[in-house]
């Protein structure tokens, strides 16, 4: 018994010792490595779930959290849900993210990246065109990549890969290089403005900086290619520009690839030589990595990466080559191993990627030998999900948290970037009357985009009303602090309205669409049918918007509605929400399911569910409840209580829509 008590007090003194890192003192030797989450909104903004996710990592007890893969340009994003820092409007979200990390006691670092040829863009940037010498290896790596995924996913992935390979024919010119250098420096300055303590440049994983270093991807004969020093010219130019833009002594780290595992690729001797150049440039630390998307799916690489501390020997050589702090990564699975690597002088810092995501209590459990760490089993489920644009998730997380994460990711496309559709003066008045519904969260909302749909012929009276409405919007929103993005106004003629609206929704990455209700104009109702994966609101004239009824069928659609409400109207003072269910089965089963749903959505366990006994059918029961309860707003899942798999037509939500008089209706798809 005494021995057990003694063990529980045991910690790893070296692992939990402090270390000076640039201007900052790290409280221990543990770093949350950058692992791409895919938790940003489609327009690149920080989402509330991303902030919550990184705050949880910071709360784990690590000394530093590195936010992964922030694109410095639109053509540098590796994912549809990539965090971005290429415009000033991203600064408020980044500032909230940095603040959330630092509030939990960790140093906040933002990793900046340009994905180069791996970017999701029609015209990817790359040092030189792909030639026949590495085409065969790319094709072979595609085979290994495809075997990594279920058969039904392979066709679309193959088509995407072939499309990318075809685009790998146009090399960057001098203008491209100068622009990207500027993109890195400006993004770094935005990170500083947002309150991050450090910035890291991503020079690994086969992304753009790595592509210039590698003879596999850089076939330029001279200048920015050729010999080793020529191939270092571009990344060094980026570093110089970034350091010039940042305040003096602001810490700048570098994610360094030690081995590329491709023909003519970066190997340890060149990596160590480059590390010494980085040290001379004033880099604050080096974070080691290995492999690229061209190599990590090969059987040989999978075997290497399956071993614990597989970069141990290489990082030991790196530490001997430089005097700045080094971070080791690569399956550091236990605190004992982590402590030993620091004690032995293999590395100064321990990087925890997937192990810390698998068990956010890893650090706290390391201080208590009586608690068992949930290990990462290297199943790569998280990687598959990220590649398939489904967001980071872990097979070892509790089921409720996995489900919650899936829901949060689905809401990223309903990203609260709003579009107001207005065609006449009556619409403008309706929007003014429905102001409480338009402002869902004062802390996280931004200016809407107003799309005016008008007749081809000029109407001076209508144009004057539009100007007044724009001014009303500014006067209303500015006092609320909506300053992170400008008010955008778009005007379209009446010809082919619906096509123009759809184009604006897609082009603008709008997640919420507000329309004024008018039963005489069928195009408004058709909007609810056509747009998918959005929040669609039909605004009525009822002035009791604060009294909200939420019909739920306890399907997956209900969970989406619950998460949406938790982020919006449930936070607003003065709103009263009633959750109702038309009972068609056993009340006990419904109550149990409601209890489970509240856990998944993070609802207060005391929120009740009102059960309605239908006299005839579900639609009649709901519409009667809406009318007798004098509700002003209805919020429900688009598929309706019947759980039908078609869009809206014939569903319960369609029936409710037909019977509404002056209420506002929100459909969450």
Regions found by a protein language model. Name each.
Residues 1-416:
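Flavin-dependent oxidoreductase catalytic cores
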Residues 413-467, 478-485, 545-610:
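Small/aliphatic-rich secondary-structure junction motif
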Residues 489-500, 613-619:
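Charged docking surfaces used in two-component/phosphorelay signaling
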Residues 421-425, 491-492, 515-519, 552-554, ...:
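Structural motif
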Residues 432, 439, 498-547, 626-669:
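Gly/Ser-rich helix-loop-strand patches that form or flank binding pockets
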Residues 32, 110-112, 254, 328, ...:
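Structural beta-sheet core signal
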Residues 104, 248, 281, 322, ...:
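Helix C-cap/helix->beta junction micro-motif
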């Amino acid at each position: 018994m005494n021995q057990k008590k003694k063990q529980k007090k045991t910690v790893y003194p070296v692992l939990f010792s402090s270390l000076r890192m640039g201007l900052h003192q790290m409280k221990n030797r543990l770093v949350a490595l950058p692992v791409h989450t895919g938790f940003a909104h489609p327009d690149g903004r920080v989402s509330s779930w991303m902030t919550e996710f990184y705050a949880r990592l910071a709360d784990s007890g690590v000394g530093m959290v590195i936010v992964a893969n922030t694109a410095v340009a639109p053509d540098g994003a590796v994912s549809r849900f990539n965090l971005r820092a290429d415009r000033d409007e991203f600064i408020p979200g980044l500032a909230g993210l940095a603040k959330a990390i630092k509030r939990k006691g960790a140093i906040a670092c933002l990793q900046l990246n340009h994905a180069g040829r791996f970017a999701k863009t029609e015209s990817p940037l790359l040092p030189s065109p792909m030639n026949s010498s590495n085409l065969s290896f790319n094709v072979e790596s595609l085979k290994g990549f495809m075997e990594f995924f279920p058969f039904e996913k392979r066709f679309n992935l193959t088509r995407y890969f072939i499309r990318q390979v075809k685009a790998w024919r146009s090399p960057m010119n001098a203008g491209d290089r100068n622009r990207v250098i500027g993109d890195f420096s400006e993004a770094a300055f935005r990170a500083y403005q947002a309150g991050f303590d450090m910035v890291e440049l991503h020079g690994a994983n086969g992304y753009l900086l790595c592509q210039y270093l590698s003879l596999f991807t850089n076939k330029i004969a001279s200048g920015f290619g050729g010999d080793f020093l020529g191939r270092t010219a571009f990344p060094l130019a980026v570093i110089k520009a970034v350091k010039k833009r940042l305040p003096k002594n602001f810490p700048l780290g570098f994610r360094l690839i030690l081995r590329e595992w491709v023909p003519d690729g970066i190997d340890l001797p060149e990596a160590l030589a480059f590390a010494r150049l980085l040290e001379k440039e004033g880099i604050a630390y080096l974070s080691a990595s290995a492999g690229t998307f061209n190599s990590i799916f090969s059987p040989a690489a999978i075997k290497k990466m399956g071993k614990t501390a597989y970069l141990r020997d290489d990082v030991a050589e790196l530490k001997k080559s430089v005097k700045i702090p080094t971070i080791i990564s690569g399956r550091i699975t236990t605190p004992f191993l982590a402590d030993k690597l620091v004690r032995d002088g293999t590395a100064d810092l321990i990087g925890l990627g997937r192990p810390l995501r698998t068990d956010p209590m890893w650090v706290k459990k390391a201080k208590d030998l009586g608690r068992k760490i949930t290990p990462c089993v290297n199943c790569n489920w998280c990687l598959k999900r990220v590649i398939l644009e489904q967001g980071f998730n872990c097979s070892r997380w509790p089921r409720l948290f996995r489900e919650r994460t899936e829901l949060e990711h689905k809401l990223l496309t309903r990203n609260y970037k709003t579009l107001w559709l207005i065609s006449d003066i009556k619409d403008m008045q309706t929007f003014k009357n429905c102001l409480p519904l338009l402002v869902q969260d004062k802390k996280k909302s931004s200016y809407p985009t107003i799309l005016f749909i008008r007749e081809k012929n000029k109407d001076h009276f209508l144009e004057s009303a539009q100007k007044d409405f724009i001014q009303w919007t500014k006067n209303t929103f500015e006092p609320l602090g909506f300053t992170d993005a400008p008010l955008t106004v778009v005007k379209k003629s009446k010809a082919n309205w619906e096509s123009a609206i759809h184009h604006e929704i897609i082009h603008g990455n709008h997640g919420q669409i507000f329309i004024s209700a008018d039963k005489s104009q069928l195009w408004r109702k058709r909007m609810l049918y056509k747009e998918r994966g959005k929040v669609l609101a039909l605004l009525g004239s009822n002035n009791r918007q604060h009294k909200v009824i939420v019909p739920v069928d306890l399907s997956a659609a209900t969970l989406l509605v619950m998460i949406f409400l938790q982020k919006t109207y449930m936070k607003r003072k003065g709103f009263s929400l009633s959750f109702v269910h038309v009972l068609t089965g056993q009340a006990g089963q419904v109550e149990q399911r409601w209890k489970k749903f509240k856990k998944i959505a993070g609802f207060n366990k005391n929120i009740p569910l009102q059960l309605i006994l239908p006299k005839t059918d579900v639609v009649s029961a709901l519409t009667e409840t809406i009318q007798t309860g004098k509700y002003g707003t209805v919020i429900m899942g688009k598929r309706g209580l019947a759980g039908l798999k078609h869009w809206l037509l014939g569903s319960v939500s369609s029936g409710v829509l037909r019977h509404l008089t002056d209420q506002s209706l929100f459909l969450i798809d």
